[in-house]
Every structure is written in C-alpha cells, then in structure tokens.
Regions:
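Active-site entrance/lid segments in N-terminal catalytic domains of soluble metabolic enzymes
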Residues: 1-155
Length: 155
C-alpha cells in the first residue's frame, strides 16, 4: 500500500495529511484536538461558544470565551506537546479579531476560518504578535503560524 505524503504548510509538517474539522459547541475541544494531533494529524479546537462551561458565560461572554481559548489550547498541548493544534474561528462572529488574537497568543499552529472571507486574518495575527512583543517574549514553544509567515520574527 502507498504511504500518504505528509501535509506541509509553510514550516509546519504534519505526518498524516488529516485535518480534523472544527465542530462547534462542545465537540471539537482539547481532548479530540489533542488526540488527533497525537495521532499525527492536525487537531482543531472550535471557538464557537467555547466558554460555555465557564460559570460567568451568560454574564461575561467575552472573558469566558477568552479564558476557554487559553485553557483548551493548554490542555490540548498537554495531550500532544509537539503535535499540530489549531483553531476553527468563524469570521461571522462579532469578536473574530479577539478570538484570533487569543488563539495566536495561546500558541495555535494554524487558524482555519470560514463563515465569511478571512481577509483580516493576517492583520489580526500581526496585531497579536505585536502585543506579544510588547509583553516581552513569545510563549513557550512559539512558532509562526504556517499560513502567515512574515520574513522574520519581530524579536
């Protein structure tokens, strides 16, 4: 049987050319994404209502979702420290820019965007990097997301 070729996107090389779809609200979270990444594919966490389990979700929707983005990414990394893990973030959401920036800061390897054209994605990724630079340094394990590779890191 022929072996499948690895998936190569920029500097990201994924052993198995499988991208797990981002299935929202509560389906594509850290356990599924981490397991897919551990198995050699690309694990995707859905940002759709990601903070629904937070106690203040109904009263503090934005902060609850931002915390959940960080927590889900950290938990997925614990399952697959070296695997390819990213987020599915719908362009049509009111807080698209905030979700993208938080996913980048959390260490996402890739961001997949649908439900609209992600024309502002590079701008939001660049803004997140600028904020990270202002804070002093990138997070542990930082690498440029493969779909937006500037010529050199800003630090």
């Amino acid at each position: 049987m022929n072996e499948l070729k690895p998936l190569v996107i920029g500097d990201l090389v994924v052993k198995k050319p499988v991208i797990q779809g981002g299935m929202g609200v509560g389906i594509s979270l850290h356990k599924l994404a981490g397991a897919v990444a551990q198995a050699g594919g690309v694990g995707i966490i859905s940002s759709a209502q990601i903070g629904f389990r937070e106690p203040d979700f109904t009263t503090n929707f934005v902060e609850a979702n931002l915390r959940a983005i960080r927590r889900e990414m950290k938990s997925a990394r614990e399952i697959s420290p070296d695997g390819a893990i990213g987020f599915n973030i719908m362009v049509a959401t009111k807080h698209y820019d905030m979700w993208v920036k938080e996913a980048v800061k959390a260490g996402a390897d890739i961001i997949i965007s649908g439900a609209g054209l992600p024309v502002s994605l590079p701008e939001h990724v660049e803004a997140a990097y600028a904020e990270m630079k202002e804070d002093g340094c990138p997070p542990a394990g930082f690498s440029w997301p493969p779909l937006y590779l500037p010529p050199s890191p800003p630090w």
